[in-house]
Amino acid sequence: MDSVTLACGNGGKETNALIERVFMPYLKEFIVAFDEDAPKFKASGEYCVSTDSFVITPLIFNGGDIGKLCVCGSANDVSVQGGEPLYLNMGFILEEGLEIPLLKQILQSIQKELFKANLKLLSLDTKVVPKGSVDKLFINTTCIGKTIKPGISSRHLKQGQAIIISDTIANHGASLFAMRHEIKLKTNLESDCQLLYPLLKPLFLSDLKIHALRDATRGGLASVLNEWANSSKVKIVIEEEKIPLKEETKGICEILGLEPYALANEGVFVLALDQKDAPKALEILKSNEKAKNACVIGGVFESPYPSVVLKNAWGFERILEMPEGELLPRIC
């Protein structure tokens, strides 16, 4: 089998061959129950669930591919709600003609991330559509996790809280911009795509009170902060010079006229907690090499009008607006 055919979606021999020869070598060990339409699992306590669809182009990019992204993306959405990711449901929409070697490469990435995340697969589905109906491969995932750090909400921001960022921003969006065919900038910049739970677990197990937590994906830092300000009816002030930014990312943004605060991340989170707890939180985060750039970038203030303010090194302030329009389609 060199490529996916429409017959691979007929539910018969060709479908079974696709599943057994292509999917199962990579995913079999993670599947909870075979030959069942709806596997069962036992649960007690509070759980969180997140569904996401992945349509990124190109399928393989610097620092990852759609396989790595779909596992990390769904698991991260559960993690930033204080949950430990446990189960994943996956649906694959395959375009007729999709090369089997490419599909296997993506499945291998999924396998690698499932190992890292210690995730099990509850259900798995494949559909094949005629050529041109989708662009090679779309993946839908639903992640289920158990809440181990309750009380996290975008409505819990109050005056006196600090805003922490876990790493340099905008690397995913900037790297995707640079490698798109219409731009083609030469760069070694990679996406920051990664699992966040290993970074967050020590915080969750500490006695720190986390008020708000979000992964800064589509819309970037600007989107997260504006959503928080509107949900909690507060003013958030961010100091521009404190926001960690790679020189290469900064250069791409300057060349293309982009604002890094609005670009997507796939392995960066934003955290709000009491100012007195910020040093301990940073100490915990920086014990992991992947969070060595974590820092306080601003704070929360009372205001009759929800807003996000960006203050530069000279003390001048401007409103950091919610991103508008489509900067770059299909980044995740």
Give residue ranges: language-model regions:
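Flexible, glycine/charged-enriched surface loops at secondary-structure junctions
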Residues: 30-35, 118-124, 207-216, 237-240, ...
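Phosphate/diphosphate-binding glycine-rich loops and adjacent basic-rich segments that engage nucleotide
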Residues: 146-192, 311, 330-332
